[in-house]
């Protein structure tokens, strides 16, 4: 809840030019018609998007880096005098609007990788937002987790708001355990007092909430040695985020809701998911992954070339409407168009089909189109890409159109490239997945279990589920549960391993079977709640109500 410093003053122009030169750029990179640095000036005017996209892009990149470095100057002073302190500021996930629970990369990731701040910190006011499901809260943690990749001393600080009225004890427990599973190591209840003594508009005036928090904290004490010395286990699948995409506003319109719904749809298939950014492609981290989900329309040329090579070496790329079609200058992206085997003619975004927040908008949105695939039916919302197979793709005859729109244009394309494959959807499958999962009722933000804000969707489109799972079919899932919609997160530590389970339904799962993959300690296990759990080889049996932790100790 602070702003990064902005460049300005008489020295800004020269500093901008020196920064660009330090990156090996030429005047023509900043402005197509320029050959002299003296003609290049920092310009943060948003109107440059159309008139001078190169300068628009590099001015924004410089603005971001300037803010990060200026913040780092202050942080370094504090670190000199307070070497053991975590230094940070609370990140609200509610704004800007298009970045609700999809934080900007330079703030949520790069700031911490460059140690401009050293304590990632955000909050879970998800119970105020009619997004698709409260599970979206975990995007905040996963973004911050991408920021602390390789930073063992940086601990994620997170507000787990127990406020009542507004939140509920069961919702709070899901969010609390979810945050632990996604990397929270410092928990903060913010305002945890009754209304009579609260110093803000927030308070907790509900006995059951106090009881739930006390219970959960006692449970945390049974595996906090793992939480504090460990980190979430990396997966084999990743979702792409980038500063380039942020600069070009790729989350505007329905694309933010589409990315949030895609994220939860992937996690609901028991697929561990990490977030990758441009630096992960250029530094080789991408090579550790087998599947990459791409929703961003703009990807830098440097990152695109690495993604393309990764596909050719065996990676599986899954793209949604318009993904990867443009580079950092808003020009056609040669690398990613080639690897997908398609060109983009246009993107249709009808007003009556737009979705900002799923619970309040999707039930009332009108479908753009409908496709049939794999024996099922998918309604299309938000955006539809008009794609055309590229000439080399047609000549090679390798691409397969797996589904078409009623007018015959391609809706789903599979394109092999050497050892790898790309799947391209001409629509936003996450929104199709949630269609009919949310009732058409008023957006009630009360604490009632019947309120829409606390509603847990379960009736998802099965055809969309199969489609979203398609690129990950060959992955070995480290944890499999006998009931659907049970999220599992693995925490690994030298002191043991914990599996955090969150039940995203309201049904108590009696006799839940949890099948373990590889790399789990042998021997007895226990539950944080103290309830019974039985182990037979790689199978565990337990009862799961809302959330739980399975604990494997190394001592």
Where are the predicted features?
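Polysaccharide-binding and catalytic clefts of secreted carbohydrate-active enzymes
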Residues: 1-139, 143
